[in-house]
Amino acid sequence: PWLVIPIARRRMRQLVGHLILDSDGEALHQLLDDARARDRRLNLNLLGEAVLGAKEAERRLQDTMALLRDPMVDYVSVKASSVVSQLNPWDFDGSVERLVGTLRPLYRFAVDAPGQSSRTAPPFINLDMEEYHDLDLTLEVFERILSEDEFMGLEAGIVLQAYLPDSVAALDRLIDFARDRTARGGAPVKVRLVKGANLSMETVTADSHGWVRAPYATKAETDANYLRLLDRALRPDVADSLRVGVASHNLFSMAAAVELARARGVDKQIDAEMLQGMAPTQQKVIQEDVGRLILYTPVVDADSFDVAVSYLVRRLEENAAEENFLHAMTSVDESERAGGDGPSPKSPQSPMSGQEARFRQ
């Protein structure tokens, strides 16, 4: 093993180098340069497992701050659970205070950054969401920080997961907060709408405790709720207060968002968001149509590449699922590939036709 494992790790990094980058590597700066040349933005997310102690939480916080200090970086995601250890759901108020105190320096740096570097605008901080039990906590922390006077002029964002039924009430809460904030002279906020990528862990947690699962039971329910969230967010009376990141590789969902926004005259309200390294052809077409494209880009510390495995497993699990859009998009019948009589993409038997049928339901 001492001989094979280092070789396997190097090969693994070569294979997934287009999906996950070193946080301080030359490849990241090359990618940032390329994104800027293509008029794209990269949303950098520092990968890592759940923190168990204060020392690891502090290290993760400093690593995130190091990303923000890089003048080429203008967009960073951070999870509440990654910078504070041992969050206790029974001590909600205490957990909020700890998180606000820990995250405040990141937002303060963003406010001060344009005056301290070549930046012309503050870097964007996106408060990420993962586990269901962090939903209310993350919402409260987000609102608490952005309600402080020193951050009223800072535009920042938060994530909502459509596979949680609670996301509808959460979005309504964020809309009210955003409208109140802009009415008081503050900057708009942004909500990044995702389908949700933590289903397996939510299932394990619920089943091991005998609880009802927090997410929807089916992909169809999640997709329907995603459209419900888009319908509530993309409105003329909200557009000046709330920006919407439409984060999906499902072209039906993306098209629905774009057409809805255009029909309501709020097409400038949305950003198209996709995953770095996945479906580049579709990314190009969507950027040409929408005009604004943000790529979610995972990065890892060079010495901690092992933490990227869980992210890669989630991506593999999602893309391998037959109900997933990317699976349907890349599924080509073997006989068709060989020039046979397999079903065409428009055939009722094709995976893509199945995707369209579920969308129209």
Question: Which residues does each PLM region occupy?
Answer:
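Positively charged, amphipathic and often flexible ligand-engagement surfaces
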Residues: P1-Q361
